[in-house]
Amino acid sequence: QMCIRDRGTGGVSLFALQFAKMVGARAMVISGSEEKMQRARDLGADEVLNYRENPEWGKQVREFSGGEGIDHIVEVGGPETLPQSLRAIRPGGTISMIGVLSGPEMKAQLGLIVTRQVRLQGITVGHRDGFEAMCRGIQASGIKPVVDRVLPFDKLLEAMELLPQGRHFGKICLEF
């Protein structure tokens, strides 16, 4: 099974990359930064793709999969990136929507969703059993979250201002 992280250099996407590699999946990371793509390779990404240089990246992603399409896409971009994810997904594949960085509303491309029988699933915190299973996997594999920086709690406003800039690689954490 192959996974893809869309705009994949934030904390959630990098954690998903680590989980994909833990279970033996081939994984691709899409980013707009050469430096971040190299760091994703260092974390185990099998392939990286620059969405700034390849705005129609769905086609290149299909090539990565041998032309069949990706089994599972972790979609954090939202309406601006979902159309390319729909081009990249294999028939019957799953797109897990875990973020909407480009906004909460879009014109849906129902034709691709229906004809490719795509499973589009929203992801939130989840349930306790899933959380416990995730924790067991983390413990067994030694996965560590990628932390870009840790700020004291009194720098909360600064941390919130850093997030939309997208310059971080991994999580921005607050220390209490």
Model regions and ranges:
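N-terminal Rossmann-like NAD(P) cofactor-binding module of classical short-chain dehydrogenase/reductase
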Residues: L49, D71-V74
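Short amphipathic alpha-helix with an adjacent loop that forms part of the alpha/beta core around
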Residues: P55-G67
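C-terminal capping/lid region of NAD(P)-dependent oxidoreductase domains
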Residues: G67, G142-V146, L157-F176
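Local beta-strand N-terminus motif with an aromatic residue
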Residues: A45, G69-I70, L156
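Mid-domain Rossmann-like dinucleotide-binding core that forms the NAD(H)/NADP(H) cofactor-binding site
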Residues: Q1-N54
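Glycine-rich phosphate-binding loop and adjacent beta-alpha segment
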Residues: V23, S31-E34, V76-R149, F153, ...
